[in-house]
């Protein structure tokens, strides 16, 4: 929150990457996943802040129930349980999807900061990898816990939140580079205009008249 407010204060005077919202974990898990591990990953996000979002999409009521029970069990011994429980109660969600396509549609619509595919290697996991494309970072496999990306594996930790992954990626040097463009026109050796310039003049003139900007059209000619 403090970093976000600092960015708001300097925005317009200095370049920033993005205004980040609460941290997000979005997990797609099937019956091959360990409910205890899935619950641990959800709580790892929930303990950050009461506004943190932990979402699980799975495919059976039985697995959803197992994860829910594990969350309650782990909260009992979690030192940060007060914050984590408020986060789970406020923003935690377990969704039962009827198919991989539905699960991917939900994920792409959410465009989460962190997307985990807690599934065995195989056709279903490959299919989800192909269907999902809106996320900050993708974590593939049962052992690919989001915390490894944050702390140890070297992945980008400054990622888009609040749906921004639909149109941008994580922080990179490119965000602090400035792009400028240049237009130069030249004549042929006989003093005539090059064909490209002629076409540009005609196009600009037509658009100027179409928009009712006569001076623009005249300037083109």
Model-derived features: where do they sit?
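Short, glycine-/Ser/Thr-/acidic-enriched flexible segments
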Residues: 1-2, 32-34, 61-62, 100-102, ...
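Structural signal for hydrophobic packing residues in well-ordered secondary-structure cores
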Residues: 6-14, 33, 46-50, 67-79, ...
